[in-house]
């Protein structure tokens, strides 16, 4: 069983291994970098990998991948022209704007991705995972950010669209992991994002592997519990 990831102090979340001289392209960059640092030695290898950024937007995740040695990044987003200009001009970045990742044709990206990261809004990861698998190599890895506010039913959302109940976090993360299992992926680790979303939503990274073993159910649940307890939601509960 993987050992639960340890949470870092959110105040130190901007202190990452690549020590950027300038800010990341978006706040999302600090979320991914923070999660990678939390995972530590258990984090996926980025250097030399062909990567795919699902929901690239302004390029926070793409930025982190490049700074940590990605060979190339396929930046996919349903919008247009959002990616930071410097990233658009980087020869290592392949821009696929106006592309709904759920319906991505693998032929559109050429060589499949070895590592896929994702920061998607207004859609459940459960609907997207099949497309991500089709766009990846047989031994690919995935580090996907679960946003409970887009996984839970609208009737369960709190004021301002914030999911505050850790029990809801637990069940939404487990549901994404179950969808991953149905698509041939195994769970490697779970970590809370050290930075909440703009409205205060706590988000979680699930680290998955294609063809990797899925831990027994209780071990999976324990990984999720530990991620919640060590993350902002657990800290908030402790402070009350």
Regions found by a protein language model. Give the residues of each.
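Conserved S-adenosyl-L-methionine
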Residues: 49, 64-72
């Amino acid at each position: 069983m993987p050992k639960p990831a340890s949470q870092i102090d959110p105040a130190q979340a901007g202190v990452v291994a690549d020590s950027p001289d300038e800010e990341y392209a978006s706040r999302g960059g600090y979320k991914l970098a923070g999660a990678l640092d939390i995972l530590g030695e258990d984090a996926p290898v980025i250097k030399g990998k062909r990567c795919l950024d699902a929901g690239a937007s302004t390029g926070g995740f793409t930025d982190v991948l490049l700074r940590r040695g990605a060979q190339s990044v396929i930046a996919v987003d349903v919008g247009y022209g959002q990616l930071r200009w410097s990233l658009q001009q980087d020869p290592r970045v392949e821009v696929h704007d106006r592309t709904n990742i759920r319906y991505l044709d693998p032929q559109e990206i050429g060589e499949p991705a070895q590592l896929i990261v994702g920061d998607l809004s207004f859609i459940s990861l459960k609907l997207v995972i099949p497309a991500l698998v089709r766009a990846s190599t047989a031994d690919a890895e995935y580090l996907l950010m679960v946003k409970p506010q887009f996984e839970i039913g609208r009737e369960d959302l709190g004021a301002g669209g914030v999911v505050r109940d850790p029990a809801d976090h637990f069940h939404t993360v487990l549901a994404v992991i179950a969808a991953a299992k149905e698509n041939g992926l195994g769970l490697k680790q779970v970590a809370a994002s050290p930075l909440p979303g703009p409205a205060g939503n706590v988000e979680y990274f699930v680290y998955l592997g294609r063809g990797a073993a899925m831990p027994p159910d209780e071990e999976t649940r324990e990984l999720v519990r530990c991620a919640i307890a060590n993350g902002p939601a657990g800290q908030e509960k402790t402070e009350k």
